[in-house]
């Protein structure tokens, strides 16, 4: 993924430099609050209503270079072969997720996309329960949520979902806490313990 890169790339577009703690600051905010924060804190020449369009452009540009992490393609193929139902629940817009996953050749593994934004952000368990219901399930313990973001992993864990934590450079500082809320923590998708899935 692109992790914390989009806000920093947006700031660079306007000649601003992201503070070292920007990623951590934004993690606790929804998209609208994050936009207002960036505009105010970095004195961006943007109105709130224009921010989302600019951010979509920034993300689309970043997604042109995203590659799969090692082991993802094989993992998805195995899950699909075993009949697992899968979807994407992301803070990013669904059409952008679909575009990059189509380019990477894995879009057909996912039944649908959920935009975890606003009132349905990953700070609230409702987005996970609604996603589970759309997959035809009702027991959160029988559903694995794969997360590289601590706040989202905590939400899923507290709601009773099985959490597979994924190491990511953007959330390296949170790794010990992410490990503590994960049923499995992976530094590589190739390390997945299939006996625990």
Regions inferred by a protein language model and the residue ranges of each:
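Metal-dependent phosphoesterase signature
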Residues: 37-74
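Asp-based, Mg2+/Mn2+-dependent phosphohydrolase catalytic module
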Residues: 77-80, 94-197
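Short, acidic loop-to-helix structural element flanking the phosphoryl-transfer center
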Residues: 60-88, 94-98, 125
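Helix-loop "lid/cap" segments that line or gate small-molecule binding pockets
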Residues: 10-11, 30-44, 100, 131-133
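Active-site neighborhood of HAD-like aspartate-dependent phosphohydrolases
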Residues: 1-24
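Residue-level detector of anion-binding/catalytic polar loops
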Residues: 17, 85, 162
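An amphipathic alpha-helix signature
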Residues: 4, 8, 31-36, 48, ...
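Short beta->alpha linker loops
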Residues: 26-30, 67-71, 92, 123, ...
């Amino acid at each position: 993924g692109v992790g914390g890169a989009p806000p920093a790339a947006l700031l660079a577009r306007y000649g601003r430099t992201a503070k070292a703690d920007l990623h951590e600051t934004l993690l606790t905010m929804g998209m609208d609050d994050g936009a207002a924060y960036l505009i105010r804190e970095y004195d961006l020449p943007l109105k709130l209503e224009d921010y989302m369009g600019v951010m979509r452009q920034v993300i689309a540009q970043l997604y042109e270079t995203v590659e799969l992490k090692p082991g993802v393609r094989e993992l998805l193929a195995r899950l699909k072969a075993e009949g697992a139902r899968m979807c994407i629940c992301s803070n990013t817009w669904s059409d952008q997720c679909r575009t990059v996953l189509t380019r990477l050749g894995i879009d057909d593994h996912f039944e649908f996309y959920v935009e975890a934004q606003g009132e349905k952000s990953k700070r609230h368990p409702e987005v996970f329960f609604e996603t589970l219901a759309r997959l035809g399930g009702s027991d959160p313990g029988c559903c694995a949520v794969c997360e590289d973001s601590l706040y989202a992993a905590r939400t899923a864990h507290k709601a009773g979902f099985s959490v597979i934590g994924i190491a990511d450079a953007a959330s390296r500082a949170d790794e010990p806490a992410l490990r503590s809320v994960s049923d499995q923590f992976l530094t590589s998708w190739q390390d997945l313990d299939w006996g625990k899935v």
